[in-house]
UniProtKB/Swiss-Prot annotation:
It comes from Mus musculus (Mouse). One of its GO terms (molecular function) is RNA polymerase II C-terminal domain binding. PANTHER family: CYCLIN-DEPENDENT KINASE INHIBITOR-RELATED PROTEIN (PTHR12460), REGULATION OF NUCLEAR PRE-MRNA DOMAIN-CONTAINING PROTEIN 2 (PTHR12460:SF40). Residues 434-445, 1272-1295 have a biased composition (Pro residues). The gene is Rprd2. This is Regulation of nuclear pre-mRNA domain-containing protein 2. Residues 419-430, 647-656, 761-771, 959-982, 1047-1073 have a biased composition (Polar residues). The modification Asymmetric dimethylarginine is found at R1375, R1432, R1438. Residues 387-396 have a biased composition (Acidic residues). Residues 576-591, 777-787, 1159-1168, 1377-1390, 1400-1409 have a biased composition (Low complexity). One of its GO terms (cellular component) is transcription preinitiation complex. Pfam families: CID. InterPro entries: CID_dom (IPR006569), ENTH_VHS (IPR008942), RPRD2_CID (IPR047885). The modification Phosphoserine is found at residues 16, 374, 392, 492, 495, 498, 504, 583, 612, 633, 682, 684, 735, 738, 749, 777, 781, 788, 836, 845, 919, 947, 984, 995, 1086, 1117. The modification Phosphothreonine is found at T376, T536, T617, T742, T751, T782.
Length: 1469
C-alpha cells in the first residue's frame, strides 16, 4: 500500500486521464474536508465506492488522514469508513471491506479517546450485528480500541524515534504493523466463517424428527436407570456396608450373603453401565439440542421479520385509511356535488363524453354511435370515447350482454336477411344514428330483394317479439342521450333519412355516400349519424329487438347510414342483394366512384355486407345459439363496417344464415364491385404504392413490421384511396392516409399518432366501435359470444368496422381486405365456419375482431407492410374459408370484392372485375373466395402490381400454409382455380377461385359461375377448402386434428363441406350456408392463419375472442381483452401481429409443431376440443402457457376440455373438441372458433404460421415465407391456387401429420387432394401446404420454427394439412367445432366419413371427426359455440387465460411484430 504503489496502481487503472498525483491530491482534499453531515459522508462514500479500483490508495489516504486529524475528525473519517464498508457489498465493491480490514486495527487504536470511543464502539457493534466482520475481527478491534491502543501507539512512537529512517522505511514498518492484525483477522475470518457456515448447515440440515428421536432415546435411558435404581434400593444386601460382614456367623450365612452380594453387585454394575451409556449419549443429545436451538432461533428471527413486516404493513394500511378518512371528510356531500352523478338509468354520456359509460342500456346505440363517430372521426371525442370504452369494461360487458340478448331473439327469427336487418337495427339503435331503426322499418322490404326480403319481411313483427329483450327505458335514455349529442354537435336532423322512409341500397348508398364525406368532416360522427337518423324508442327498439323482419331496406338504411357515416356507402341492400342485381351495387358503385376510395371500399362492403348480414347474423347467432338466422342482422353491420375489406369480407361470411341477403349483396356488389373495382384497380397500384410508401415512410410501422396485409397491401395508398370513405370515418381509427396516400393525421376523428395508433385501437372510432362491439358483445361471454353481441355490435361493428376498416384499410385497400379478413374476416369466417352460432358469433367476434383488427391494423400499420404478405394470407384464409363453406364464399366474395375494389379488384382488369362481379352474384360466395384466393393471391397479385403484397401474400400463405394453402386451394380451389389463377391472376384466377368457391356455393345451392371451373373449383374448393380448413384446424389443433376433423365433414364431401354447411346452416340456403360456412371457416382460417388471423383472433375477435376464445390464453385477460379490444386496436394489431410474433415466439417456443404438438399435444384435445383452432390456440397459447403456465396449458387443455366442454358440450358432443374451442374463446362460438383457430392457426399457424409469417414475415419470415410466397408472389398465389392443389400430395403428409385425420381423411375424398379431401378443406390446405404449407409453410415454418416446424411444422404443416384440418375446423375448428358439434356430428358423421377417422384420431372418429369436421365445416352453424362464448367469458375469468393478457404482448408478435412498441395490452389492462 505504498504511496508510490498506490499512485502507480491509480495511474495504471485509472479510467480517467487524471494522474495518480491528481487522485491523491483529490483524496487528501476530500478526506481533509469531510464533515459529520450525512450529505458529506454519503457523498464521499459514494465517490469512494465508484472509484473502487483505487481502493488501496483510498484506504491508505484514509489512514493517513486518520493519523493526522484531531479526534473529532477521526470520528468523521470512521463514519466515512463505516458508510463505505456497509454499502460496498451492495454496490459491488466488497473489496473495500478487505482493504479497510487491513488498517482498522491500527485505526481503532487511534480513536480510543473517550470523546469518540463510544461512537466508535457503536460502529463496531453495528458491524457485529450485521455480520460485516467476523466476531474475532470485532474482538480484535475492540481490544485495539481499549487496551492494545497503548502498546500500538508506543510502537508507532518508537518508529517515529528513528530520525534516520526514511519515509519508505517507516511506511514499511507501518504496513508490517498493520499486517499482523490483518492476518489475525483473516485467520479469525477463516475460523469464523466455518462457524457461520456450520450454523447455516445446521439450519439447512436440521430435522426435527432426529431431535425427537434423540430425546426419546434419552428418556428411555433415564427410565431404565430409574428402574435399576429402584431395584438396587430394594436389595436386602447393602453391598457397600462392611458391617454386614461382621454379622456373618456361619458358612451358610456366608454363602447366602455371598449370593446376595453378587446379585446386588451385578445389578449395581448394570446401573453403572447404564449411566455410562447416558454419559456417552449425552454429547450427541446436547449437540442435537444445540442445533435445535440454533435452528429454532433462526426460524424465530425469520418469523419475527415476517411478523414485523405484517405489523408494519398493518400500520401503513391504518395510516392510509386514516388519510383516506380525512380526505373523505373533506369531500362534499353527494347532494351538494356541482355535477351530480347521473341516475342508474340515465342515458349514457354523449358528445365528447364517452358514449360507453352509459353502455348498460344504451349499448346497442353506443356501438353505432361510436362507429359513426369513427366514421366522422371526432378528433378528441373519438379517442376519448375509445378510452372510455376501454375504461368501462364492465358497463360494456353488460350492454354487450343486453345487445346479445336482443340479438339472440332476433337471431331466433331464422331469417337470413332478417338477422341482418336486426343487426342493422340494433346497430342503429346502438349507434343511435337509428337510420337503421328507421331503415329497418323502411328498408325491410326493399333491400333484401331475394332472400332478405322474404326473411326480412317479418321485420315489423319481429321487433315486437323481441321487446321482451329490449329495455325500453334504457333505449329511451339512449335516445335522449343521442338526441342531446346531436343537439350538442349541432348536426341537422334534416340530413338524416326519415326512419320510415325505406331506402333502396342505391338510395342509401348514393345518398349516404354523399353524407359520408359530410359526416367525416363532422366532429361528432355519432351526432352526424344521429342527425341522419331519427331515433325513436320504436326505432331503437326495433333495432335492439333485432327485428329480423327489418328487410334489406332497413338494413340498407342502417347500412347506408353506417356507410355514409363510415364513408363506406355500400348499402346493406347491396349487401343484402348480393344476388339481387347490379343496380344497387351500381348505385353504390357510382356513389363510390364519387368517392374513389370509398367506391372500392363500397364494393368490398357490398361483398362484406353480403357476408356482413351473415356476420351480423353470426354475431346474433352467437348471441343466441339457437338463432341460426341471425346471420341476417350482420348484413347491415357488414355493410357498415364490413367495408373494411377484411372485416367486410368476413362479415359477409357471417352471412351464411342470410344467404339470400348475401346473394342480394352479391348482385349489388357485382355491379358495385365492377364499378368500384376499376377505381380500385386504378387506385390499387397507387394505393398499394401509397400504402407501401406510407408504411415505408413511417418508421413506426416498419418497426412494428406487422404482417398486416392491409398495412402492407393497403399501405397508405390503399387506405387513402380505398378508404376515402372509410377514412372519413376511419381516419380516427388509424393514421389516416390522405386521399393521395399521404399519411395524414386526421384530427377530425382525433386520429391518434402512429404511436398512439400502436398503443391505441388506432382509430378512436374503431376503438370506440370495438369497445362498443365488445360492450355489446359482452353478452356473449366468449369472444364469439362477445361477438355475438354483434347484432348490436354488428351494427356498431359495421360502423366500427368501417372505422376500423377505414383504419384498417388505410393501410392497404386491397390488402386491407385480406388483412382484415385474416383478422376480422378470418375470424369471422371462422365463426361463420363454425355454425349458425358461429355465424352469429363470427360476426360478433369478427366484427369485434375486425374492429379491433382495424384498431390493430391502425396499430399495425407498420405491420401493414408485413401484412402485404399477410394480406394474401388473409386472402388465402378467405379462400380457405371459402372452401370451407360456400357460406363463406359470400364473405369471401365480399371480401374479395372488397379486396378487389381495394386492391385485388383494382389490381384486376375491369374485365376480370366484371368476371368477379358476375361471378360474385351467383358465385359471390365462391367468387369472393376466389377473390380472396385471388386476394390472398390476388391481394398478392395486387401485390404483384404492388410487389410486396403478393410476396406477403405468399408469405402469408406460407406462414399460414394452412391458410395459405386453404386460401389458395380455396382461391384456386387448387386445381381449377389454380389454372385459372395463373390464367388471369386478377381476372381468371379470381374468377376461378370464385368459381370454385362458387362451385362450392353451387353445391350448396349457389349456381357456379363457371360451370366446369366452378364445379371443379367447387369440388376442389369445397373439398380443398374444407380439407384446407380442416388442415388449418388440424394445424391449429394439430394434436387434436385427429379428433377435430371438423374438416372431415368438409373433406368428407368436397361438396359435402358445402353440404355440411348446408346441414349446419339449414336455415341458410345450401349454397349460402356453405358459402357462409365456407366463408366463416375461411374467416376463421384467415384469422388463425394470418397475422391478421392472429390479430383477428387476437386482434379482432380474439380480443374478445382472445378474451373469450383465448380465455385460457388471452381472455383471462378476458375482461381486459374486452377493453383491449377497444383499446387495443393497435394492441390488437399488435396483438394480432404481436400474436403472430408471439406466436412466432410461441410457435417457436411451441413451434407450430410444438405449439401444435405441445399445445395441441396438450392442446391436442384442446385442438380437438376447441377444434384445432383451440388446439392451435392451445398450442400457441399452451406454448406460451407452457412457458408461462404449463398448468395453464393443461388448463387450456383442461379448460378446453372442461370449460370448453361444458361450454360446448351443449354444442359439441365431443367435449375435447369443445375444449379447444373454449380455449379459443372464439372457437367457442362459431365466432369464437375462428379467432381461436385463428389463434391456433394464427397462433399456432396463424399466429404461429403467421407467426411464421411474422417469423418468416416479420423476422423476415417473408424471406422464408416470402421466399415461398414472395419467391413467386403471383406464382405462389397461383401455386396456392394451383400448386397447392397439385400439392395435394403434401396433404397426405399433412394427413399423416394430421394424425391421419388429414391423411386418412384426405385419402377418402381426395380426388385431387385425396389426403386432404378427407378433410374436405384439407385438400386445399394440403396443396398450399405442399406448396406453401408443406413446402413453403413447412419450409417457412421450419425456418420460422426451425426444427420444430420442420418436423413438427412439417407435421404441423402437414398437420397444417391435417392440423390445418384441425385448424380449418380448428381455425374454424373450435369455432366450427363448437358450432358444428350439433350439426357437425350429423354433417361430420357423413362428411367425416372417411375423414372422420383421421379427424377423430384424437377424439372419437365419428364424434370428434364429426365434431371436428362439423365444427370445422359446419361448426359455425352450430350455435353451440355460442354457449362456448359464454363459458369463454368464464374462461375470460379464468386465470390461466388471464395470463394471456401478458402473452398478448407476445402476441404482439415478438420482435417482428413488435408492432406497437408498447404492446398496449398491459397498459390497457
Amino acid at each position: 500500500m505504498a504511496a508510490g504503489g498506490g499512485g502507480g496502481s491509480s495511474k495504471a487503472s485509472s479510467s480517467s486521464a487524471s494522474s495518480a498525483g491528481a487522485l491523491e491530491s483529490s483524496l487528501d482534499r476530500k478526506f481533509q474536508s469531510v464533515t459529520n453531515t450525512m450529505e458529506s459522508i454519503q457523498g464521499l462514500s459514494s465517490w469512494c465506492i465508484e472509484n473502487k479500483k483505487h481502493h488501496s490508495t483510498i484506504v491508505y489516504h484514509w489512514m493517513k488522514w486518520l493519523r493526522r486529524s484531531t479526534y473529532p475528525h477521526r470520528l468523521n473519517l470512521f463514519y466515512l469508513a463505516n458508510d463505505v464498508i456497509q454499502n460496498c457489498k451492495r454496490k459491488n465493491a466488497i473489496i473495500f471491506r478487505e482493504s479497510f480490514a487491513d488498517v482498522l486495527p491500527e485505526a481503532a487504536a487511534l480513536v480510543k479517546d473517550p470523546s469518540v470511543s463510544k461512537s466508535i464502539e457503536r460502529i463496531f457493534k453495528i458491524w457485529e450485528d450485521r455480520n460485516v466482520y467476523p466476531e474475532d475481527m470485532i474482538v480484535a478491534l475492540r481490544e485495539a480500541l481499549m487496551d492494545r491502543a497503548a502498546s500500538h501507539n508506543a510502537r508507532l512512537q518508537k518508529l517515529q524515534c528513528f530520525p534516520g529512517t526514511t519515509f519508505k522505511t517507516q511506511k514499511q514498518l507501518k504496513e508490517n504493523l498493520n499486517k499482523q492484525p490483518n492476518k489475525q483477522w483473516k485467520k479469525s475470518q477463516t475460523s469464523t466463517n466455518p462457524k457461520a457456515a456450520l450454523k447455516s448447515k445446521i439450519v439447512a440440515e436440521f430435522r426435527s424428527q432426529a431431535l425427537i428421536e434423540e430425546l426419546l432415546m434419552y428418556k428411555r435411558s433415564e427410565d431404565q436407570i430409574e428402574l435399576k435404581e429402584k431395584q438396587l434400593s430394594t436389595m436386602r444386601v447393602d453391598v457397600c456396608s462392611t458391617e454386614t460382614l461382621k454379622c456373618l456367623k456361619d458358612k451358610t450365612g456366608g454363602k447366602k450373603f455371598s449370593k446376595e452380594f453378587e446379585e446386588a453387585s451385578s445389578k449395581l454394575e448394570e446401573f453403572v453401565n447404564g449411566l455410562d451409556k447416558q454419559v456417552k449419549n449425552g454429547p450427541s443429545l446436547t449437540e442435537a439440542l444445540e442445533n435445535a436451538g440454533i435452528f429454532y432461533e433462526a426460524q424465530y428471527k425469520e418469523v419475527k421479520v415476517v411478523a414485523n413486516a405484517y405489523k408494519t404493513f398493518a400500520n401503513r394500511v391504518n395510516n392510509l385509511k386514516k388519510k383516506l378518512d380525512q380526505l373523505k371528510s373533506t369531500l362534499p356531500d353527494p347532494e351538494e356535488s356541482p355535477v351530480p352523478s347521473p341516475s342508474m338509468d340515465a342515458p349514457s354520456p354523449t358528445g365528447s363524453e364517452s358514449p360507453f359509460q352509459g353502455m348498460g342500456g344504451e349499448e346497442p346505440q353506443s356501438p353505432a354511435m361510436e362507429s359513426d363517430k369513427s366514421a366522422t372521426p371526432e378528433p378528441v371525442t373519438d379517442n376519448r370515447d375509445v378510452e372510455d370504452m376501454e375504461l368501462s369494461d364492465v358497463e360494456d360487458d353488460g350492454s354487450k350482454i343486453i345487445v346479445e340478448d336482443r340479438k339472440e331473439k332476433p337471431v331466433e327469427k331464422p331469417a337470413v336477411s332478417t338477422g341482418v336487418p336486426t343487426k342493422s337495427t340494433e346497430s342503429v339503435s346502438k349507434a343511435s344514428p337509428c337510420a337503421p331503426p328507421s331503415v329497418p322499418t323502411t328498408a325491410a322490404p326493399p333491400l333484401p330483394k331475394p332472400l332478405s326480403t322474404a326473411l326480412l319481411s317479418p321485420s315489423p313483427t319481429l321487433v315486437l317479439p323481441n321487446l321482451a329483450n329490449v329495455d325500453l327505458a334504457k333505449i329511451s335514455s339512449i335516445l335522449s342521450s343521442l338526441t342531446s349529442v346531436m343537439k350538442n354537435t349541432g348536426v341537422s336532423s334534416a340530413s338524416r333519412p326519415s326512419p320510415g322512409i325505406p331506402t333502396s341500397p342505391s338510395n342509401l348508398s348514393s345518398g349516404l355516400k354523399t353524407p359520408a364525406p359530410a359526416t367525416t368532416p363532422s366532429h361528432n360522427p355519432l351526432a352526424n349519424i344521429l342527425s341522419k337518423v331519427e331515433i325513436t324508442p320504436e326505432s331503437i327498439l326495433s333495432a335492439l329487438s333485432k327485428t329480423q323482419t327489418q328487410s334489406a331496406p332497413a338494413l340498407q338504411g342502417l347500412s347506408s347510414l353506417l356507410q355514409s357515416v363510415t364513408a363506406n356507402p355500400v348499402p346493406a341492400s347491396e349487401v343484402t342483394s348480393q344476388s339481387t342485381t347490379a343496380s344497387p351495387a351500381s348505385t353504390t358503385g357510382s356513389a363510390v366512384k364519387g368517392r374513389n376510395l370509398l367506391s372500392s371500399t363500397q364494393s368490398f362492403i357490398p361483398k362484406s355486407f353480403n357476408y356482413s348480414p351473415s356476420s351480423s347474423t353470426s354475431e346474433v347467432s352467437s348471441t343466441s345459439a339457437s338463432k341460426a338466422s341471425v346471420g341476417q342482422s350482420p348484413v347491415l353491420p357488414s355493410t357498415t363496417f364490413k367495408l373494411p375489406s377484411s372485416s367486410l369480407g368476413f362479415t359477409g361470411t357471417h352471412n351464411p344464415s342470410p344467404a339470400a341477403p348475401p346473394t342480394e349483396v352479391a348482385v349489388c356488389q357485382s355491379s358495385e364491385v365492377s364499378k368500384p373495382k376499376p377505381e380500385s384497380e386504378s387506385t390499387s397500384p397507387s394505393l398499394e404504392m401509397k400504402i407501401h410508401n406510407f408504411l415505408k415512410g413511417n418508421p413506426g410501422f416498419s418497426g412494428l413490421n406487422l404482417n398486416i396485409p392491409i398495412l402492407s397491401s393497403l399501405g397508405s395508398s390503399a387506405p387513402s384511396e380505398g378508404h376515402a370513405s372509410d377514412f372519413q370515418r376511419g381516419p380516427t381509427s388509424t393514421s389516416v392516409d390522405s386521399i393521395d396516400g399521404t399519411p395524414v393525421r386526421d384530427e377530425r376523428s382525433g386520429t391518434p399518432t402512429q404511436d398512439e395508433m400502436m398503443d391505441k385501437p388506432t382509430s378512436s372510432s374503431v376503438d370506440t366501435m370495438s369497445l362498443l362491439s365488445k360492450i355489446i358483445s359482452p353478452g356473449s361471454s366468449t369472444p364469439s359470444s362477445t361477438r355475438s353481441p354483434p347484432p348490436g355490435r354488428d351494427e356498431s361493428y359495421p360502423q366500427e368496422l368501417p372505422n376500423s376498416v377505414s383504419t384498417y384499410r388505410p393501410f392497404g385497400l386491397g390488402s386491407d381486405s385480406p388483412y382484415k379478413q385474416p383478422s376480422g374476416g378470418v375470424e369471422r369466417p371462422s365463426s361463420l365456419m363454425d355454425s349458425s352460432q358461429e355465424k352469429l358469433f363470427p360476426d360478433t367476434s369478427f366484427q369485434e375482431d375486425e374492429d379491433y383488427r382495424d384498431f390493430e391494423y391502425s396499430g399495425p400499420p407498420p405491420s401493414a407492410m408485413m401484412n402485404l404478405e399477410k394480406k394474401p394470407a388473409k386472402s388465402i384464409l378467405k379462400s380457405s374459408k371459402l372452401s370451407d363453406a360456400t357460406e363463406y364464399q359470400p364473405i369471401l366474395s365480399s371480401y374479395n370484392h372488397r379486396a378487389q375494389e381495394f386492391g385485388v379488384k383494382s389490381a384486376f382488369p375491369p374485365s376480370v372485375r366484371a368476371l368477379l362481379d358476375s361471378s360474385e352474384n351467383c358465385d359471390r360466395l365462391s367468387s369472393p373466395p376466389g377473390l380472396f384466393g385471388a386476394f390472398n393471391i390476388r391481394g398478392n397479385e395486387p401485390g404483384s402490381e404492388r410487389s410486396p403484397s403478393p410476396s406477403k401474400n405468399d408469405a402469408f400463405f406460407t406462414p399460414d400454409s394452412n391458410h395459405s394453402g386453404l386460401s389458395q386451394s380455396t382461391a384456386g380451389h387448387l386445381t381449377l382455380p389454380q389454372t385459372q389463377y395463373p390464367d388471369s391472376p386478377h381476372s381468371v384466377p379470381h374468377r376461378s377461385i370464385f368459381s370454385s368457391q362458387s362451385t362450392l356455393a353451387a353445391p350448396a345451392g349457389h349456381p357456379p359461375t363457371s360451370g366446369v371451373e366452378k364445379v371443379l373449383a367447387s369440388t376442389i374448393s369445397t373439398t380443398s377448402t374444407i380439407e384446407f380448413k380442416n388442415m388449418l384446424k388440424n394445424a391449429s389443433r394439430k394434436p387434436s386434428d385427429d379428433k377435430h376433423f371438423g374438416q372431415t365433414p368438409n373433406k368428407g364431401t368436397s361438396s359435402d363441406g358445402v353440404s355440411l354447411s348446408n346441414l349446419t346452416q339449414p336455415s341458410l340456403p345450401t349454397t349460402d350456408q356453405q358459402q357462409e360456412e365456407h366463408y366463416r371457416i375461411e374467416t376463421r382460417v384467415s384469422s388463425s392463419c394470418l397475422d391478421l388471423p392472429d390479430s383477428t383472433e387476437e386482434k379482432g375477435a380474439p380480443i374478445e375472442t382472445l378474451g373469450y376464445h383465448n380465455a385460457a390464453n388471452r381472455r383471462m385477460s378476458g375482461e381486459p381483452i374486452k377493453t383491449v379490444e377497444s383499446i387495443r386496436v393497435p394492441g390488437k394489431g399488435n396483438r394480432g401481429h404481436g400474436r403472430e410474433v408471439s406466436r412466432v415466439g410461441w410457435f417457436d417456443l411451441s413451434t407450430p409443431g410444438s405449439s401444435f404438438d405441445n399445445g395441441p399435444s396438450s392442446a391436442s384435445e384442446l385442438a380437438s376440443l376447441g377444434g384445432g383452432g383451440s388446439g392451435g390456440l392451445t398450442g400457441f397459447k399452451t406454448t406460451p402457457y407452457k412457458e408461462r403456465a404449463p398448468q395453464f396449458q393443461e388448463s387450456v387443455t383442461s379448460f378446453r376440455s372442461n370449460s370448453f366442454n361444458s361450454t360446448f358440450e351443449h354444442h359439441l358432443p365431443p367435449s375435447p373438441l369443445e375444449h379447444g374451442a373454449p380455449f379459443q374463446r372464439e372457437p367457442v362460438g362459431p365466432s369464437s372458433a375462428p379467432p381461436a383457430p385463428p389463434k391456433d392457426h394464427g397462433g399456432i399457424f396463424s399466429r404461429e404460421a403467421p407467426t411464421h409469417l411474422p417469423s418468416v414475415d416479420l423476422s423476415n419470415p417473408f424471406t422464408k415465407e416470402a421466399s415461398l410466397a414472395h419467391a413467386g408472389p403471383p406464382p405462389p398465389p397461383g401455386e396456392h391456387s394451383g400448386v397447392p392443389f397439385p400439392p395435394p400430395p403434401p396433404p397426405p403428409p399433412p394427413g399423416e401429420l394430421s394424425s391421419g385425420g388429414t391423411g386418412v381423411p384426405f385419402a377418402t375424398p381426395a380426388p385431387p387432394p385425396p389426403p386432404v379431401d378427407h378433410s374436405g378443406v384439407v385438400p386445399f390446405p394440403t396443396p398450399p401446404l405442399p406448396e406453401h404449407g408443406v413446402t413453403g409453410a413447412v419450409s417457412v415454418f421450419p425456418k420460422d420454427h426451425s426444427s420444430l416446424l420442420q418436423g413438427t411444422m412439417a407435421e404441423h404443416f402437414g398437420v397444417l394439412t391435417g392440423p390445418r384440418d384441425l385448424n380449418g375446423p380448428g381455425l374454424n375448428r373450435s369455432r366450427e367445432s363448437l358450432s358444428l358439434p350439433s350439426h357437425p356430428l350429423e354433417h361430420l358423421g357423413p362428411a367425416l366419413g372417411g375423414g372422420g377417422g383421421g379427424n377423430t384420431s384424437s377424439s372419437g372418429l365419428p364424434l370428434s371427426p364429426a365434431h371436428r369436421d362439423a365444427i370445422g365445416r359446419s361448426g359455425m352453424i352450430l350455435r353451440s359455440p355460442r354457449p362456448d362464448f359464454r363459458p369463454r367469458e368464464a374462461f375470460l375469468g379464468r386465470d390461466p387465460f388471464h395470463s394471456l393478457k401478458r402473452p398478448r404482448p407476445p402476441f404482439v408478435r415478438g420482435p417482428p411484430f413488435f408492432a406497437p412498441k408498447r404492446p398496449f395490452f398491459p397498459p390497457r389492462y
